[in-house]
């Protein structure tokens, strides 16, 4: 094998290692059976959420996972494999892919990684049911606001009762 081909392969592996290291979550999927239109739509939805979808040879993925120090992903790198990398939102790739797989039965989630730890299929599916980061923050905010709101209503009720003339 020529030196240039080996260098190109090493560069691809290094690029994938960098994506592994920068990602907060990764979802590995089997896209066999999807039409071009379906893959294009999936890529579009992922891109809108800031998630990159890559189709890389399984050999390169195995080498990159080993080089990045992620053991346990090798079993997911079989057959036609696509990988979704998210650098910001942990929930986004799992949620988008799980929702998309409801309409495209051929799409199959194989596994992934969540914040540096290898995740099983069940963990990825559980993650997909969670609200997004913004949704979780709004829930937290409403929980924090509830006691303050109740105190404000109580103070207003007391003030209103003092304003009413005695009967």
From Swiss-Prot:
InterPro entries assigned: Ribosomal_uL10, Ribosomal_uL10-like_sf, Ribosomal_uL10_bac, Ribosomal_uL10_bac_type, Ribosomal_uL10_CS_bac
Q: Which GO terms describe its cellular component?
A: large ribosomal subunit
Its source organism is: Latilactobacillus sakei subsp. sakei (strain 23K) (Lactobacillus sakei subsp. sakei)
Keywords recorded for this protein, A-Z: Ribonucleoprotein, Ribosomal protein, RNA-binding, rRNA-binding
Q: How does it assemble?
A: Part of the ribosomal stalk of the 50S ribosomal subunit. The N-terminus interacts with L11 and the large rRNA to form the base of the stalk. The C-terminus forms an elongated spine to which L12 dimers bind in a sequential fashion forming a multimeric L10(L12)X complex.
Protein name, please? Large ribosomal subunit protein uL10
- Superkingdom classification of source: Bacteria
Tell me its family. Answer: Belongs to the universal ribosomal protein uL10 family.
* PANTHER family per record: 39S RIBOSOMAL PROTEIN L10, MITOCHONDRIAL
A Pfam family that this protein carries is Ribosomal_L10
Q: What does this protein do?
A: Forms part of the ribosomal stalk, playing a central role in the interaction of the ribosome with GTP-bound translation factors.
One of the protein's GO biological processes: translation
Q: Which SUPFAM superfamilies match?
A: Ribosomal protein L10-like (SSF160369)
For the keyword Ion transport, the answer is: no
MF-aspect GO terms? large ribosomal subunit rRNA binding; structural constituent of ribosome
């Amino acid at each position: 094998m020529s030196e240039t081909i080996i260098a190109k392969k090493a560069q691809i592996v290094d690029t994938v290692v960098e994506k592994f290291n920068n990602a907060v979550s990764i979802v590995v999927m089997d896209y066999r059976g999807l039409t071009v239109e379906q893959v294009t739509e999936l890529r579009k939805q992922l891109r809108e959420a800031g998630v990159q979808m890559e189709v890389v040879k399984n050999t390169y993925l195995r080498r990159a996972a080993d080089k990045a120090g992620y053991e346990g992903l090798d079993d997911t790198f079989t057959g036609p494999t696509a990988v979704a990398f998210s650098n910001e939102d942990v929930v986004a790739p799992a949620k988008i892919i799980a929702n998309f797989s409801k309409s495209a039965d051929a799409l199959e989630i194989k596994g992934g990684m969540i914040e540096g730890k290898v995740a099983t299929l069940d963990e990825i599916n559980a993650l997909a049911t969670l609200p997004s980061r913004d949704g979780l923050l709004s829930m937290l905010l409403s929980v924090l606001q509830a006691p303050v709101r109740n105190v404000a209503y109580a103070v207003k009720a007391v003030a209103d009762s003092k304003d009413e003339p005695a009967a």
